[in-house]
Amino acid sequence: FLRMAGLRRGLLRPSCVICVPSGATWVERRSLAAAAEALRPRCHARLVDETVAAAAGAGFDLAAGAGAFIVDIGGGTTEVAVLAGGHVVRAQSLRVGGNAMDEAIVNAVRAELGLLLGRNAARSLKMALGLADGTPGSMETVGVDAGRRTPRVEQVSAWLVASALEHCVTAIGDAVQEMLSDIPPNLAEDVVRGKVRIAGGGALLPGLASRIEAAAGIPALVVDDPLRCVVLGAAEILEHGGTYPPSGEPSG
């Protein structure tokens, strides 16, 4: 991966930012740094918590020491974090993300309709119907009949998709609620004024922001460019490195 990113021998004193999940161990973090060093001995590799990069990309003024609340929903995990400036105050990593949502839809459609779906078809249903919350509607999809093993066209209801996603969405909402229940008083005003900001590909799920807002009890919004939020934040950190602490650095 580091070679694909362009961190290879021959570059002149390259610098890079490597974003790591909040749940990454010290061993995993050191291994990443060592891998970067092995590819380019004079490389300046900077490890940064993914939630810090997401918050920077979401427009939080971390340089001013502001408090921030970020929910980063990726393919495999969801990162929920409270930050003060460039420091992670509290974070939680969930094994729930866009892939788990797709799998839940695949399983629900097979159980209810006897139809085998591919991941792309499940993803299309997810993005088109989302969290319908009782709104009637359906979408046509094509899969394989589980019994006959032949192609079949089927209408999938919005209710079925929303029901399939309920477990994943509830887990994210519970994590947000738990994080807010233990927020330091000195950060409360910043978090309320800055709102819960949702990033990552999973943020594009229709209806998700309103569900998170209901769980949080404070306003929530999807950032302007959720798919590139972490990358944009990493670029910001690379350009203004001194403003942001390295991953795992004590905040005191």
Predicted regions and their residues:
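Nucleotide/phosphate-binding catalytic cleft detector across ATP-hydrolyzing
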Residues: F1-I70, L83-R197, A203-G252
